[in-house]
């Protein structure tokens, strides 16, 4: 069973639309091709609605303003934010803005398919830091990751906002998903799910 804020939100959207959601797990790079070929109907995977991606898919209204944070081991005193990543080995998930941010900071970047690989490498010392969605970092810390790891420095904002994606061929689906999202925000479901996963209230 897959879990996460995105999954809970997707299921709640399905409920509002009166349809059952079936979750398929795919590598991040495979998501847009799968959507365009009709293999899946919607992407709910913390995807930044970037201008490049907007050429290929239709995005809903953003449901999350996320950023990217630097995470290091607790005993690390040399890395206190993005400015200290130059010349370091830094892990980040393939296809995400984290890779770009780490590269821009002058790091040697190791790319992972799954965030779990990043946590493992960080704990075993094969990378110095991980650049990851702030939301993922917050959740991981809340679930006990803060025993060994810490978030350092300020987060860098993800400009476009995080949104669900649907095929450009399905404008009616986009409309329904947007309406369901608006309803979930209005009836308090969204805030409840947000608090459940991140331990904080959503920023207005």
Task: Please state what every model-predicted region is.
Residues 22-33, 77, 94-96, 110-124, ...:
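Short helix-initiation/N-cap motifs at beta->coil->alpha
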Residues 1, 10-19, 95-115, 141-146:
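Ligand-binding cleft/hinge of the Venus flytrap
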Residues 60, 73-89:
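Flexible hinge/capping segments at coil-to-helix
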Residues 13, 35-36, 85, 122-123, ...:
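Hydrophobic residues within well-ordered alpha-helices
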Residues 1-46, 187:
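Extracytoplasmic small-molecule ligand-binding "clamshell" domains
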Residues 65-72, 134, 138, 142-182, ...:
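Periplasmic-binding protein-like
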Residues 18-20, 36-45, 88-89, 124-136, ...:
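Alpha-to-beta junction loops
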Residues 7-16, 76, 94-96, 161-201:
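Extended ligand-binding regions for polar small-molecule ligands
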């Amino acid at each position: 069973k897959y879990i996460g804020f995105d999954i809970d939100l997707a299921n709640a959207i399905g409920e509002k639309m009166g349809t059952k959601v079936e979750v398929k797990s795919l590598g991040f790079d495979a998501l847009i091709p799968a959507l365009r070929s009709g293999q899946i109907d919607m992407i709910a995977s913390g995807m930044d609605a970037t201008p490049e991606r907007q050429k290929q898919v239709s995005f809903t209204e953003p449901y999350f303003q996320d950023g990217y944070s630097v995470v290091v081991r607790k005993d690390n005193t040399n890395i206190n934010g993005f400015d200290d990543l130059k010349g370091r080995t830094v892990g980040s998930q393939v296809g995400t803005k984290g890779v770009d941010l780490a590269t821009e900071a002058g790091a040697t970047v190791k790319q992972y398919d799954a965030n779990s690989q990043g946590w493992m490498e960080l704990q075993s010392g094969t990378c110095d830091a991980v650049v990851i969605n702030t939301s993922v970092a917050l959740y991981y810390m809340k679930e006990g990751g803060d025993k060994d790891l810490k978030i350092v420095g300020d987060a860098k904002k993800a400009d476009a906002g995080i949104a669900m994606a649907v095929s450009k061929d399905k404008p009616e689906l986009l409309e329904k998903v947007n309406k369901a999202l608006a309803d979930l925000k209005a009836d308090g479901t969204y805030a409840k799910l947000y608090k459940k996963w991140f331990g904080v209230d959503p920023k207005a």
